[in-house]
A protein has these predicted regions:
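Short S/T/G/P-rich N-terminal loop/turn motif that feeds into the first structured element of a domain
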Residues: 1-50, 54-68, 75-93
Length: 93
Protein backbone atom coordinates (compact mmCIF):
# COMPACT_ATOMS: atom_id res chain seq x y z
CA UNK A 1 0.00 0.00 0.00
CA UNK A 2 1.25 3.48 -0.84
CA UNK A 3 2.16 6.21 1.62
CA UNK A 4 1.65 9.97 1.40
CA UNK A 5 4.44 12.27 2.57
CA UNK A 6 4.08 15.99 3.33
CA UNK A 7 7.26 17.97 3.91
CA UNK A 8 7.22 20.50 6.79
CA UNK A 9 9.16 23.25 5.05
CA UNK A 10 8.03 26.82 4.60
CA UNK A 11 9.53 29.80 2.85
CA UNK A 12 11.23 27.57 0.28
CA UNK A 13 11.78 29.61 -2.86
CA UNK A 14 11.22 28.32 -6.36
CA UNK A 15 14.95 28.87 -6.94
CA UNK A 16 15.84 26.63 -3.97
CA UNK A 17 13.38 23.97 -5.14
CA UNK A 18 14.78 24.09 -8.69
CA UNK A 19 18.36 23.85 -7.36
CA UNK A 20 17.58 20.71 -5.37
CA UNK A 21 15.71 19.11 -8.28
CA UNK A 22 18.48 19.98 -10.75
CA UNK A 23 21.19 18.60 -8.44
CA UNK A 24 19.25 15.37 -7.90
CA UNK A 25 18.71 15.06 -11.66
CA UNK A 26 22.41 15.61 -12.32
CA UNK A 27 23.29 12.89 -9.81
CA UNK A 28 20.86 10.46 -11.48
CA UNK A 29 18.57 10.48 -8.43
CA UNK A 30 15.56 12.22 -10.03
CA UNK A 31 12.93 11.08 -10.50
CA UNK A 32 13.42 8.84 -7.47
CA UNK A 33 12.75 5.11 -7.57
CA UNK A 34 9.46 4.34 -5.86
CA UNK A 35 7.95 7.83 -6.04
CA UNK A 36 4.53 7.48 -7.65
CA UNK A 37 3.56 11.15 -7.54
CA UNK A 38 5.42 14.37 -6.73
CA UNK A 39 3.50 17.64 -6.36
CA UNK A 40 5.20 20.99 -5.80
CA UNK A 41 2.82 23.91 -5.35
CA UNK A 42 2.44 27.38 -3.92
CA UNK A 43 3.76 30.87 -4.62
CA UNK A 44 7.35 31.33 -5.80
CA UNK A 45 8.50 32.26 -2.28
CA UNK A 46 6.73 29.41 -0.43
CA UNK A 47 6.88 26.16 -2.41
CA UNK A 48 5.33 23.14 -0.67
CA UNK A 49 5.86 19.48 -1.60
CA UNK A 50 3.74 16.37 -1.16
CA UNK A 51 4.55 12.94 -2.55
CA UNK A 52 3.04 9.48 -2.87
CA UNK A 53 5.50 6.60 -2.48
CA UNK A 54 5.21 2.88 -3.18
CA UNK A 55 6.72 2.03 0.22
CA UNK A 56 8.14 3.74 3.30
CA UNK A 57 11.47 1.97 2.70
CA UNK A 58 11.84 3.54 -0.75
CA UNK A 59 11.00 6.95 0.70
CA UNK A 60 13.59 6.54 3.48
CA UNK A 61 16.22 5.43 0.96
CA UNK A 62 15.61 8.55 -1.11
CA UNK A 63 15.74 10.68 2.05
CA UNK A 64 19.40 9.76 2.45
CA UNK A 65 20.06 11.35 -0.96
CA UNK A 66 17.71 14.28 -0.45
CA UNK A 67 18.92 15.57 2.94
CA UNK A 68 22.37 16.75 1.77
CA UNK A 69 20.78 18.52 -1.21
CA UNK A 70 18.30 20.34 1.04
CA UNK A 71 21.12 21.46 3.35
CA UNK A 72 23.23 22.63 0.42
CA UNK A 73 20.31 24.73 -0.88
CA UNK A 74 19.72 26.24 2.57
CA UNK A 75 16.38 24.51 3.12
CA UNK A 76 15.58 23.59 6.70
CA UNK A 77 12.69 21.32 7.56
CA UNK A 78 10.63 22.22 10.62
CA UNK A 79 10.67 18.60 11.79
CA UNK A 80 10.21 15.20 10.24
CA UNK A 81 7.93 14.82 7.21
CA UNK A 82 4.36 13.77 7.93
CA UNK A 83 3.76 10.22 6.70
CA UNK A 84 0.27 8.83 6.13
CA UNK A 85 -0.04 5.06 5.69
CA UNK A 86 -2.44 3.06 3.54
CA UNK A 87 -3.05 5.72 0.91
CA UNK A 88 -5.21 4.66 -2.01
CA UNK A 89 -4.19 6.17 -5.34
CA UNK A 90 -6.68 6.35 -8.19
CA UNK A 91 -5.28 7.25 -11.60
CA UNK A 92 -7.84 8.96 -13.80
CA UNK A 93 -5.70 10.10 -16.71
Amino acid sequence: MSILVRFPASNVSKQQYDTVRDNLTGAGDWPPDGCELHVAFGPDDDIRVSEVWQTADKFRSFGDKLRPQLEQAGIQLAGEPEVFDDVHVVETL
